Amino acid sequence: MEIEEIKVQTEVNGAPFIIETGYFAKQANGAVIVRQGDTAVLVAAVMSEEPQADIDFLPLTVEYREKYYAYGKIPGGFVKREGKPTDREILVARNIDRPIRPLFPKGFYNDIVITAYTLSADDKYDPDVLGIVGASAALHISDIPFEGPIAGVRVCRVNGEFIVNPTYQQKAQADIEIVVAGSKDAIVMVEGGAKEVPEEDILEAMMFGHQEIKKLIELQEELRLKCGKEKIQVAIDEEEIILKDKLKEFSYEKIKEAFKITDKKQRNKTINAIFEEAFKTLEIPEEKIKKASFIYKDIVSNVMRDNILNEGIRIDGRKPEEIRPIWIKVGVFPRNHGSAIFTRGQTQAFVTVTLGSLSEGQIEESIEAGEVMKRFMLHYNFPPFSTGEAKPPRATSRREIGHGNLAERALEPLIPPEEEFPYAIRVVSDILESNGSTSMATVCGGSLALFDAGVPMKKHVAGIAMGLIKAEDKFVILSDILGDEDHLGDMDFKVAGTRDGVTSIQMDIKVKGLTKEILEKALQQARDGRNYILDLMYQAIPEPRKEVSPYAPTVTTLRVLPDKIPIIIGPAGKNIKKIIEETKVKIDLDPEGLVKIYATSKEAAEKAVSMINELILDVEVGEVYMGKVTRVEDYGAFVELLPGRLSLLHVSQITGERLKSAKEKIKVGDVLKVKVSEIDDQGRIKVSLKDVPENVEPKNKFLFKEE
């Protein structure tokens, strides 16, 4: 059996970058393996035989999975196989989906499934951007109609220099980290974060990445020349064109009037009524009603776009750069550690902050870092009632995970380090109303709630979503877009940051690419809008509260010798469990000797400190201790004073009487009050029972309260 291996190769960041095909997954419409270093990602693209009926969207599904075998591990836990997708896998799948989705032809409704597996992972190169290149390459060499290719790269800036597809080590040192995807002529997707970097630097990073993207596109073109299949043609529906002309003639002006209604619900109700009227007047057959509704949606979109492009009038009457009215309230409920309501027009986020011990952080496992503890978390929830829909709540969606990650990345650079603020921090954003920009409302509400919680952030962070309406060479950038402007427009460009620079950025488009001019204007307009919002946020709460909530745990820090940590824990955790049960505190122990006590009251913290200090006591000559007898011989008994610290009670030191054997008076398990009489050069302890003074409290009495 002969199998042809087809390979093309270039170099990225000093490492070979290879795309290969021909010897695997041959029943898929297209399949490739993309390699950089020892990291390899398989991507397969499959198309259904027939299109779906009665839909007006592209049924594209992207799945990305990081196989444990790729980095030489067996899954932990009882079930030894990969489970549901992790948050990271979902986020990478979204990054693969977003740049390819705009590049399928209009009217193409066949199911497309893109599956990406990380087959091998080294300790240098992140496989996520290889998945973007692989998805494009698999589609490009297949017979699936795809108006690509595109490519994706990660751009980082380390010590002032831009690097494409950096190693993990380089990425950790970067002040800019973005994933950029683009075609030969323009950028189609951006996702990433920065440490308060000026917009000009972000744009420079995008353009730098685009130069490398062109090289990877040439590589895909070379691969297609070697093995590309003939593309299927998408049929033009002549009947649809006729129906569109009729609907447009009947409804265009009426829809234009409806767009003068600024209330979203009333406007949509009127637009729906116009369609019902058109359906009856034009006598559209029942079997074509679904198709007619999709065509009508396009006409509605065109009316909105024409109003903005030609008259500068938006759906709610605002100018292109105008931001909706903002209302802010902080400290909403007393029992939340921090809370805020951020309302912008018909978009509202209720955001809370909860502080906890460091051990309450999220444990995550990834190819990059293995198992790590994440102390700052942001969770975004989008209930159906926020849009007035009568639907039951569902499991967390990919969209919710993506929006939460975007907002988390925006706030994280301003979160103080663990040494300064030793708490795990959980931010939760519940969207109460939605009409566009809910993730950016989450950023603003999150910053306000963190200030309210007393988290010592140096600055507020705000976010704004920008839109675009583009027709040929004419375009208008929209600030603070509505939901309809997002759905019917050409771009959703979210930018978050402080007054000093950008911390998070995300761009999705529905056209085939954006020029540098459009990106530059969008970033500038976003900065102006962000600064306006920040002014209002500083008016609401100008600085973080001086103290955390009385209902939040206080942190008391102790420094002990590292060899005392096992003593604090005790056998099978006995000692630390006892402290926690009696004081209701939480305790984090560091192997280096740092002890953090999280308590909800000053008294509980003081009691826990006292109990720990008693535990780590050093045995001193002349002091009185309690001890448990662990062994008895004729010549004496062995008494444990502290965990692991045995002493000898000689038979002559038990009573004033002469005893033949210690067993006459003492048995294993007895708890005795003894006085330390001697500690020799080797640390061996001798104690006396007969010389114990009356009315003296043992220094380690705490250990024996239950005895």
Swiss-Prot record:
PROSITE patterns associated with the record: KH_TYPE_1, S1
Taxonomy, superkingdom: Bacteria
InterPro entries found in the cross-reference section: ExoRNase_PH_dom1, ExoRNase_PH_dom2, ExoRNase_PH_dom2_sf, KH_dom, KH_dom_type_1, KH_dom_type_1_sf, NA-bd_OB-fold, PNPase
Swiss-Prot/TrEMBL cofactor(s): Mg(2+)
Residue runs in coiled coils: none
Signal peptide: none
Keyword presence, Nucleotidyltransferase: yes
Gene Ontology terms: cellular component: cytosol
Domain S1 motif: 622-690
MF terms (GO), sorted A to Z: 3'-5'-RNA exonuclease activity; magnesium ion binding; polyribonucleotide nucleotidyltransferase activity; RNA binding
Residues annotated for Mg(2+) binding in this entry: 486, 492
EC number assigned by the record: 2.7.7.8
Pfam family membership, one: RNase_PH
Subcellular locations according to the entry: Cytoplasm
Family per similarity comment: Belongs to the polyribonucleotide nucleotidyltransferase family.
UniProt-recorded name of the protein: Polyribonucleotide nucleotidyltransferase
